[in-house]
Amino acid sequence: MKASFLKKIWIIIVTVTSTLWICLLVFYLRLTRTYNREYADSVLRWWSGVLLREVGASWEVSDTHNVTIKPGRPHIIMANHRSYFDIPLSFVSLPGSIRMLAKKELFKVPIWGQGMKAAEFISIDRHDLDQALKDLAEARQIMQSGIVLWVAPEGTRSRTGRLGDFKKGGFMLALQTGAIIIPVGIQGSETILPPDTFDFVLGRKVEVNIGEPVDASLYNIEQRDALMQKVRQAIEGLAGEEK
């Protein structure tokens, strides 16, 4: 069922106010040196639940491999990206202290940008190679501290519902850190909010499928393309895109 005009306005108000609140909260915790990662995790999951409840979404998680986060090993979640709702769905469905690798432009948004940085999200500069390398070095450090990095290997949301071409950055990071890649396929998130619209659809059901982890430490730099292909095939299957 499509949301009415008033419901759309309400969803937008709740989204903006709850997002501003958690950004200010995390920023305050940083300023007062009382930041706690586990508490930040719980706040992000609370925020995600609020957004999903407002659109009446339900979700089912399939984890046939019983994926867990191995202490002492870097982890990268690589997921298809069809909707803004992939982010809250990931927070409520996937294991670990998840943070996103996001384009630098988002960090320039007042309050939101400061909140993301305070909560240990990582920016990536898509247009400046030297800065991108510095960003990836920062990502390596934060992964070593226990953060599970969420990456959309396409680099952006799909407007067609199909996987686009993969970018190399996330895979280079996985190879450099010997990370465990957790492939994830999200089915149905685009039906909640179609691309480039505010036409919310209420009561949709989404599937979050967690695949078999891929150990990037078993690959070398010359095998990068093989690693990319393996992960791509996994995500295609999990996202229901198998040919």
Which positions does each model-derived feature cover?
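Membrane-interfacial terminal anchoring regions of lipid-handling membrane enzymes
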Residues: 1-30, 42, 67-69, 222-243
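Non-catalytic C-terminal accessory region of glycerolipid acyltransferases
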Residues: 2-6, 133-243
